[in-house]
Amino acid sequence: MGIGYIIGCLFSILLWRLDRQRIFNFISVKSKDKIKNVYVVQFLYLFLIFVIYLGLAFIKNNQVYNAITAFIVIDISNTERENLKNNEKKHFYDTISTISRALICGFITPLFLIVMFGNGLAIVFTILYNLSADEDLNILGFIVSIANIIPSIMAEVFLYIIYVFRNRNLKIKFKGDYISNLFIVPLLNVDILAAFIESVNFYSYHNGNNMHYLKSYGDYNNKIDNVCIKDYLSISYSICFLVFIAFLVIQLI
């Protein structure tokens, strides 16, 4: 049964103010101060993470281990709540991405990995995800993006259904970028769907052909404000609830 996962999830929600990324950011800063080559740093991280995974493989599954795993990997960040206090437009755009990232990386992907591969790989993903917040660690970021592909599609299915019922429209304009986003920046497609649901524009920076440019997605019918952000946040929590129920059902089968 999934009682251990339920307890771990509840503790994670109760301790939502615990900023895991601040801990990993401290580790990353100290490591880069000692070792100047970021590729060497990433190699050492991957080696240590592999050792951790081997150690976790020897732990027998039980409800205590399940509870600890759920507490570690489920991380609905408090960052978006903090950003609600800031009314600058830039912060609202950041907040949409933060909510999407928390939904995928802090919830759906870890649970997906538990179902498919067990607790150990979910913990490994969480470590990689938090370390990859440092954009210099591009290899770790690439691994995290690959792991997010299928979970992103799962979230997009929920978001698309909500979009269709709310807007009475089947068409989403990804401007020909859906496939490239899916394999390079899978979370961007989630952000785009969120923009269409809330009827706002979402801007993304792109690099290509020696050019840096800004691309706009969504519909400019509303401005991004507290109401929009709170609505998307509630949608995100609803998806988390449905995914967790499905996860528990799978555990019972």
Task: Outline where the language-model segments fall.
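Hydrophobic N-terminal alpha-helices or hydrophobic patches in metabolic proteins across all domains
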Residues: 1-253
